[in-house]
Swiss-Prot record:
Protein name: ADP-L-glycero-D-manno-heptose-6-epimerase
Pathway note: Nucleotide-sugar biosynthesis; ADP-L-glycero-beta-D-manno-heptose biosynthesis; ADP-L-glycero-beta-D-manno-heptose from D-glycero-beta-D-manno-heptose 7-phosphate: step 4/4
Binding site for NADP(+): 11-12, 32-33, 39, 54, 75-79, 92, 143, 169, 177
Binding partners and assembly: Homopentamer.
Cofactor note: Binds 1 NADP(+) per subunit.
Residues the entry annotates as binding substrate: N168, R179, H186, F200, G201, E202, Y203, R213, Y292
HAMAP family xrefs: Heptose_epimerase (MF_01601)
Organism, scientific name: Burkholderia cenocepacia (strain ATCC BAA-245 / DSM 16553 / LMG 16656 / NCTC 13227 / J2315 / CF5610) (Burkholderia cepacia (strain J2315))
EC annotation from Swiss-Prot or TrEMBL: 5.1.3.20
Length: 330
């Protein structure tokens, strides 16, 4: 049967297409908006059955033009947290998602979709409960509002609905994201260009570079999506992070040591990297004060209860792999 991936030329969507290909799945309809044409590169090594613009797709899907569709991986969205056009964000992320959901429910199609940890805003608890959800920007609000729709329809849904609140995802095929690409991507490029990585200094009681995030490899994000694809009886909204908060220092230090290893140089401790000027701390910008999360960490209770028991890559493991992949692309 046919599979559909929206946002297929994007970061996570393209990784899902590639992972499906590795299982022998090629009857895939890739849906995206290639106004920014450089994203096509993410699909060059992938096999798909057809490509459709996102506007054409939603109309044809509702008409039943694709016959029996087993599953939709809905990864397409505007993920720019700095976007201020609320009308565009709500049309693109909320209204469009509702249209795809409605058709999946009518046709009995599995619906696996991208939510976001941005829903939690400034919360210090990251559990899938309404009382800790307080988005700080319109991107987070668009995701939050759609999750509320899901909560209302889940009790009566006859087919799978699985939403994943992605934390800080990094990995291959994110180059097109520019400023919204991961910290690992920017650290890699900065070190290659300047010979050092710059991190924020002390802020809000956190030592330089010790502000933390739940950094999750796109490899693990893809594996979780495919686990639920294989288990259509499992529905709900799930955090998708490692369950470990790791400091930005870990990202930067791993980037530096992996690039050193590729240059046949020995690893250095964080202290040695700082002493040698390979990591530099800059004053925390005034513009971000009061708007910056110093800590995120996914509560994995629901995900583990659903039966996903595979370990997640640490920053040291995942970023090392990613830097080696990036080095092979330049």
């Amino acid at each position: 049967m046919t599979l559909i991936v929206t946002g297929a030329a994007g970061f996570i969507g393209a990784n899902i297409v590639k992972a499906l290909n590795e299982r022998g799945e090629t009857r895939i309809i890739a849906v995206d908006n290639l106004t920014r044409a450089d994203k096509f590169r993410n699909l060059v090594d992938c096999e798909i059955d057809d490509y459709l613009d996102k506007t054409e797709f939603v109309e044809r899907f509702a008409r039943g033009d694709f016959g029996k569709v087993r599953a939709v991986f809905h990864e397409g969205a505007c993920s720019d947290t700095m976007e201020t056009d609320g009308r565009y964000m709500m049309d693109n992320n909320f209204r469009y998602s509702r249209a795809v959901l409605d058709t999946c429910l009518m046709q009995g199609t599995q619906f696996l979709y991208a939510s976001s940890a941005a829903i939690y805003g400034g919360s210090t608890r990251f559990v899938e409960e309404r009382d800790v959800e307080a988005p700080l920007n319109v991107y987070g609000y668009s995701k939050f509002l759609f999750d509320q729709v899901i909560r209302r329809v889940l009790p009566s849904a006859k087919s799978q609905i699985a939403g994943f609140r992605y934390f800080n995802v990094y990995g291959p095929r994110e180059t097109h994201k520019g400023r919204m690409a991961s910290v690992a991507f920017h650290n890699f490029n900065q070190f290659r260009a300047e010979g050092k990585v710059k991190l924020f200094g002390e802020y809000n009681g956190y030592a330089p570079g010790e502000q933390t995030r739940d950094f999750v490899s796109v490899e693990d994000v893809t594996k979780v999506n495919l686990f639920f694809f294989d288990h259509p009886e499992k529905s709900g909204i799930f955090n998708l992070g490692t369950g470990r908060a790791q400091p930005f220092n870990d990202i930067a230090s791993t980037v530096v040591n992996t690039l050193r290893a590729l240059d046949n140089q020995p690893p250095l401790t964080l202290a040695q990297q700082v002493e040698q000027g390979l990591i530099e701390y800059v004053p925390f910008p005034d513009a971000l004060r009061g708007k910056y999360q110093c800590f995120t960490q996914a509560d994995q209770t629901k995900l583990r209860a659903a039966g996903y028991d595979a370990p997640f890559l640490t920053v040291q493991e995942g970023v090392d792999r990613y830097v080696r992949w990036l080095s092979g692309q330049v």
